[in-house]
């Protein structure tokens, strides 16, 4: 019995992260140092809608400051989103503060995601010559890292100021590189202006505005469409998320802060991909699907593996064959990259509680295959308190609370496997939900046994999986990789149609 359908926890957290790309409002500031002394503190409010329902707001404020005799710009961005997941409320608040030169070069930032009851995560960054010093706090523990840095990398808010200071004209393009805190990486941003179009607003009114397409390399499949007035100010910004449209409108403070109505958007229901019934999907040894990825190259969305073969039919269409790979009776551990065994900020395999759970679950067996089987079953039985209000907790947090949904099952299982010396990673994709006859966003775990990546799903507890999972991306959740939530990017931007062939 599948007990936790349509897991969208970390996906819900990823939506505000996309807000850094789609909602940082157009604030009247100058990118020309000569104009910096004329810049006054300004602010912009936005109301955010998804599938026609208000889901949150954002506020951007910017002010000129003088520091050590230099003119700088200080920007503050705050957003708050409210959703429902199978009837339970989920609230996520995001804060981004940046300090940059008047021509947009990033100097320092503070980034926070708050999602009660889980602990907040914080990231700070300070440019020190040719290095960016990052400090990330997860579950109260700080991890410091460094990245090579170029002085011309822009702030996350620069694209809007660029349009305001020097508005694009139809047919013009502009490119630059900017840092995205949620991804802990630099992305190449491209702006492309089209013609004036009649643009409708939430209040029924419309304006003729310049259509501007924004793309960036961090999430290649995501296209943000902005609509600018003659001053270069973005009055409306939209993009497709989870197969639906998210729109941010520039509004008054009073409009932005209006209470969200009681019938908040239920993402777990609104983002399902309906298919014909698949009897006993999680017991089947093999299944064929035709997958269409609207607006994206299908081979950039789906990931081949030992359990999933992909036959390309067209640029956006593929035939996918999913074949079950059961846990073997016995297995040995083969050499793998260190990242699949290392403790990390989200997979704290060295945490005392995580190690204790792994020991209790494994018992006296030393056979890695049997350990994997027992750990999966243990979490299926013990981690049975639903908490759909948490977006993405670390393994150590889950080990303390023993509550959550598919994300928490996958992360804790991966950490427990590593605590027993078994290489692991998490997988993002879609899973078939029997009761809803639909596929929903999901996360599960893979263990490396005898050199093969064997799928495990602690929300099912069946000793492996059948043919009801569609795989998109796998991640070690290494501290050296992109931000943890970024692994959900392909799932969030995907616009899938799934046809059951067998």
PLM region spans:
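N-terminal secretory signal peptides that target proteins for export/translocation
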Residues: 1-12
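Bacterial N-terminal signal peptides
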Residues: 12-25
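Sec/Tat signal peptide C-region and signal peptidase I cleavage site
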Residues: 26-30
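Acidic, serine/threonine-rich low-complexity disordered tracts
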Residues: 31-149, 164-329, 481, 490-492, ...
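Secondary-structure boundary elements
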Residues: 156-160, 324-326, 331-404, 412, ...
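Short, well-structured beta-strand/strand-turn elements
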Residues: 218, 240, 388, 420-434
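Active-site rim recognition segments
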Residues: 248-261, 265-267, 333, 381, ...
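Cysteine-centered nucleophilic/redox motifs
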Residues: 375, 402-430, 445-446
């Amino acid at each position: 019995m599948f007990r936790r359908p349509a897991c969208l926890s970390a996906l819900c957290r990823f939506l505000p992260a996309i807000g850094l790309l789609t909602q940082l409002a157009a604030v009247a500031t100058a990118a020309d140092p000569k104009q910096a002394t004329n810049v006054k503190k300004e602010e912009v409010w936005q109301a955010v809608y998804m599938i026609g329902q208000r889901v949150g707001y954002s506020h951007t404020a910017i002010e000129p400051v003088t520091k050590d005799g230099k003119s700088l710009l200080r920007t503050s961005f705050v957003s708050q989103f409210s959703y429902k997941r199978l009837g339970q409320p989920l609230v996520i608040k995001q804060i981004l503060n940046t300090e940059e030169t008047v021509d947009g070069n990033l100097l320092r930032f503070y980034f926070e995601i708050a999602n009660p009851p889980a602990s907040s995560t914080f990231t700070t960054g300070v440019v020190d010559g040719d290095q960016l010093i990052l400090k990330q706090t997860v579950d109260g523990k700080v991890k410091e890292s460094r990245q090579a840095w170029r002085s011309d990398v822009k702030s996350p808010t620069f694209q809007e100021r660029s349009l305001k200071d020097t508005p694009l004209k139809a047919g013009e393009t502009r490119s630059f590189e900017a840092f995205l805190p949620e991804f802990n990486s630099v992305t190449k941003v491209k702006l492309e202006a089209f013609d004036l179009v009649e643009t409708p607003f939430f209040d029924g009114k419309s304006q003729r505005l310049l259509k501007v397409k924004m793309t960036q390399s961090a999430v290649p499949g995501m296209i943000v469409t902005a609509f600018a007035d003659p001053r270069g100010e973005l009055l409306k910004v939209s993009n497709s998320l989870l197969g639906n449209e998210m729109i941010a409108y520039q509004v008054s403070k009073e409009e932005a802060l209006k209470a969200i109505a009681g019938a908040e958007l239920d993402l777990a229901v609104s983002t399902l991909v309906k298919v014909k019934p698949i009897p006993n999907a999680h017991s089947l040894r093999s299944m064929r699907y035709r997958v269409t990825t609207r607006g994206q190259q299908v081979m950039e969305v789906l990931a081949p593996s030992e359990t999933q073969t992909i036959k390309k039919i067209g640029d956006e269409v593929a035939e996918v064959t999913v074949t079950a790979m059961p846990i073997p009776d016995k297995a040995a551990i083969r050499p793998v990259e260190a990242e699949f065994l290392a403790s990390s900020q989200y997979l704290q395999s060295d945490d005392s509680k995580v190690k204790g759970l792994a020991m209790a679950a494994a018992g006296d067996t030393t056979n890695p295959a049997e350990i994997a089987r027992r750990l999966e079953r243990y979490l299926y039985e013990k981690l049975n308190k639903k908490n759909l209000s948490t977006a993405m907790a670390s393994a150590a947090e889950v080990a303390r609370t023993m509550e959550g949904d598919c994300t928490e099952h996958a992360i804790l299982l991966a950490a427990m496997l590593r605590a027993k010396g078994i290489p692991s990673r998490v997988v993002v994709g879609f899973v078939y939900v029997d009761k809803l006859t639909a596929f929903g966003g999901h996360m599960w775990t893979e263990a490396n046994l005898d050199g093969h990546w064997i799928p495990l799903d602690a929300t099912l507890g069946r000793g492996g999986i059948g043919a009801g999972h569609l795989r998109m991306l796998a991640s070690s959740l290494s501290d050296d990789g992109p931000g943890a939530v970024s692994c959900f990017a392909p799932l969030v931007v995907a616009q899938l149609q799934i046809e059951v062939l067998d």
